[in-house]
Amino acid sequence: QNNLEYYKDKRFITIGFENHPMIKNYDWIEISYKQADKSFSIASLNGVLAYDREYNKCLKKKKKINKEFKSLFTIKPETYSGKHPVDKSGKSNFENTEFYLNDGIVVTTCIDWSKKMEKKYFDHLKVFISTNEFWNWINSNPY
């Protein structure tokens, strides 16, 4: 278990679990909750798969996962790509697909970090399920 400190604002805490015997489909699981919440209600649950320099394989797996979500939800997702905001050089890329639900969001994303950023991060696919409150916080909270 690792306490992950991605963001400057500490309103939410994210804990990561790697190589846990209960984790079958992902390399890493992240659970986020509001720091002040004594009941530890989950605000976000994420599954992460490492894709070391295999961005096309990541996109292929993401497409397969999105197909499963499309069979569950009646809403049309939004897909977009761009430069990752953490990498100020503009050499890291991502592709997101977002399913907006009434009380939350489901996002699948592939991130292809630049060689420099790979010293700190790893290329990966993330399946992100969160409350609207957490999603709004994460998008307004600088790294």
Predicted segments, located by residue:
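N-terminal Sec/ER secretory leader and immediately downstream segment
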Residues: 1-31
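Short amphipathic beta-strand and strand-loop transition segments with alternating hydrophobic
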Residues: 18, 27-35, 81-86, 110-112
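Non-cytosolic coordination micro-motifs
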Residues: 1-3, 7-11, 44-143
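N-terminal low-complexity, intrinsically disordered segments
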Residues: 22-52
